[in-house]
Structures are given as C-alpha cells and as structure tokens.
C-alpha cells in the first residue's frame, strides 16, 4: 500500500508539482499540502486523472494550531476505490482568509464544510449554503477552537414550567480545582532487589 502511495506521490510531483506545496509519507499515509489558490485545481486533478481516481470525498475536518500564524488546517480525506488508495490534502489558513469551497468538485463537501465553519470558524467561498449545522442559530463562537472556554458561554436547558428551551449564563457549582497529583503509574524512586539494571 505505501509503495503504491510513494509511486503516486512521485507521479503527482511530476504531473502537478506546481499545485503541491509539500508531499509527506508518514506512517504509510500520503499527505499533500497545497494553497487555497491551488486547492480546487488539485482536487479536480485527483478526481479526474486516470492514475488517481479519487472520486470519493470521505471527510473534511479542521485542526486548530493557535501558536501558528496560519492557525487552521483544513484537511480533505479522499478515497480512490479503483486503486484502493486513500490520501489526505491539507490547506493552511487564518481566521480571516477564506478557503475555496470543494462543492463544485465534490458535491458531498456541503455539510463537511458547514461543520468545519461551525466548529472552527473557517470560511469557504463559493459554498451554496454556509450556515451553522451542529450548534444553535444564536450560538456565539466556534467550540472546537483551542481558545473556546470548556464551559461554554451559556447553559441551555428545557424549562418545563415555561414549556420552552431557555438560555442562562453558565453557573459553575464549584470553584475551579486543579488536581495535581503524582501518577500512581510513574512508580517509586527506590530500586527493588533485582531491578538494578532496569533503572540504569
């Protein structure tokens, strides 16, 4: 499998190297990194080329790297049923730079891009219906960003007396506590008889 992916990586470098910023084989998986400007052209080539045949878009997801200038990675997972191969295509972007929508190439990208926008705040240009898909309409923020508070901003519950869903400020039942204990799995500092070599 990884031999076929290595051959594919060299073929893509020759055929469309201008669309690929980086190519990486790691753990038997091929990851192509491209730019937003080249994304649609690369996805179209991967779908239409006879040696590729990546006709299935399995998933699109986001990754948040807050310490980087281009904070987000948008990751496309593709499948070629004829070749029995999977690859990953990555595009890096920031909070203000939109990524071109993959919907013209893979119509199934619609909900994946909506989810990525809803969870991370990554904008997609040319998307037919970019709106929230998992969170509520009035939701503030994007919950999978690393800077989103783990408690959220509001608490949502059904009020049986009012017969409707109500939003309330988050009220923590106890103060934040930091449990900083030694792990019982780290072991002790002393050496038992017979373990002298293991501690060296």
Curated annotation (Swiss-Prot):
Any single Gene Ontology cellular-component annotation: plasma membrane
PROSITE patterns in UniProt: COMPLEX1_30K
Top-level enzyme category: translocase
EC number: 7.1.1.-
Places the protein is found: Cell inner membrane
Statement: the UniProt record of this protein carries the keyword Transcription: no
Keywords tagged on the record: Cell inner membrane, Cell membrane, Membrane, NAD, Quinone, Translocase, Transport, Ubiquinone
Catalytic activity: a quinone + NADH + 5 H(+)(in) = a quinol + NAD(+) + 4 H(+)(out)
Keyword Cell membrane attached: yes
Record Gene3D superfamilies: NADH:ubiquinone oxidoreductase, 30kDa subunit
Family of the protein in this entry: Belongs to the complex I 30 kDa subunit family.
Assembly, per entry: NDH-1 is composed of 14 different subunits. Subunits NuoB, C, D, E, F, and G constitute the peripheral sector of the complex.
Name of this protein: NADH-quinone oxidoreductase subunit C
Organism: Rhizobium johnstonii (strain DSM 114642 / LMG 32736 / 3841)
């Amino acid at each position: 499998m990884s031999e076929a992916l290595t051959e594919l990586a060299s073929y893509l470098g020759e055929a469309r190297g201008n669309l690929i910023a980086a190519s990486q084989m790691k753990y038997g998986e091929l990851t192509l990194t491209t730019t937003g400007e080249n994304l649609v052209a690369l996805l179209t080539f991967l779908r239409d080329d006879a040696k590729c045949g990546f006709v299935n878009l399995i998933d699109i997801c986001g990754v948040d790297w807050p310490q980087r200038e281009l904070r987000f990675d948008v990751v496309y997972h593709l499948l070629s049923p004829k070749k029995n191969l999977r690859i990953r295509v990555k595009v890096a972007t920031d909070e203000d730079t939109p990524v071109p929508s993959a919907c013209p190439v893979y119509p199934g990208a619609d909900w994946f891009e909506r989810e990525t926008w809803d969870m991370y705040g990554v904008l997609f240009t040319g998307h037919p219906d970019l709106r929230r898909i998992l969170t509520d309409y009035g939701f503030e923020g994007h919950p999978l960003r690393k800077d989103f508070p783990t408690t959220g901003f509001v608490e949502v519950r059904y009020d049986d007396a009012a017969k409707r869903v109500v939003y309330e400020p988050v009220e923590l039942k106890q103060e934040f506590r930091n449990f900083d204990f030694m792990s019982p799995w780290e072991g002790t500092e002393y050496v038992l008889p017979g373990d002298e070599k293991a501690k060296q």
